[in-house]
Amino acid sequence: LAQLGAGGAVCFASGFAEAAGEDASGSDLQARLVAAAGDMPILGPNCYGFINALDGALLWPDQHGCKRVDRGVAILTQSSNIAINLTMQQRALPIAYTVTCGNMAQTSQASIAQALLDDPRVTAIGLHIEGFGDLRAWEALARTAYDRGVPLVALKSGASDHAKSAAISH
């Protein structure tokens, strides 16, 4: 896709670094994916992609409960299962974006959240975080969100050894 000039891609497939405990070649496969992508941004692997309910665009392989909205919250999580469940909420929370980032082989959760802040129709960002990578990127995100008056709501999971193991393998 990168050679064809695609603007980006979503890798829905699993069996990459998240499966390294069962298949040692998963990490190598993920490295080859990143190398093949080059400068082309990719979400995933091991994710459901994204739903843009503002513009009616999505790369999402399953059912969801999002409806078109003019403005609303962005939800960003590594977990596709959590994302699906959140889109099915019936509380009339206007969801502008739902983005799953899976393994974050190339594009980090903090950088995706920074990009979501660039849309003035986003009123808040909800983050389900399984692990922090570059802390400076998270600090920059918090600073940008504060400066723009966009609340960040973060739920950090995977603190215990058992939870960390589950977060890595799910």
Please place each PLM-identified region on the residue numbering.
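Catalytic-core regions of core metabolic enzymes
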Residues: 1-170
